[in-house]
């Protein structure tokens, strides 16, 4: 009986660690995602400015092209973070013991 109690306690502690790890990862990714969203907005503003400056002959095409490249990199990083957020939410849900939602009827 004591062995069963110890095994149960170990199982509960393992579950708590899994929940804590999943929540920590998810929280960190949420913070990173917010930073990446801000970087995307700043990159979009920089690209718009570079594009307008190029259209008015105030800068060369390479400056506008570099700003666009930076924007695309920021968008990609933000999209990848969005995917990690979704996976992190799945990990939290699984750690909490929730069952996946059933497939809708066709």
Regions inferred by a protein language model and the residue ranges of each:
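Amphipathic alpha-helical coiled-coil segments
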Residues: 1-77, 84-95
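Amphipathic alpha-helical coiled-coil scaffold segments and their short linker/junction regions
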Residues: 101-106
């Amino acid at each position: 009986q004591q062995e069963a109690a110890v095994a149960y306690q170990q199982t509960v502690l393992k579950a708590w660690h899994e929940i804590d790890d999943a929540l920590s990862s998810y929280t960190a990714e949420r913070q990173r995602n917010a930073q990446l969203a801000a970087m995307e907005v700043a990159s979009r503003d920089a690209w718009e400015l570079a594009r307008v400056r190029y259209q008015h002959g105030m800068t060369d095409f390479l400056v506008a092209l570099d700003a666009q490249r930076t924007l695309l990199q920021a968008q990609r990083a933000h999209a990848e973070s969005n995917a990690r957020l979704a996976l992190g939410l799945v990990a939290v849900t699984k750690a909490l013991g929730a069952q996946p939602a059933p497939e809708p009827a066709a």
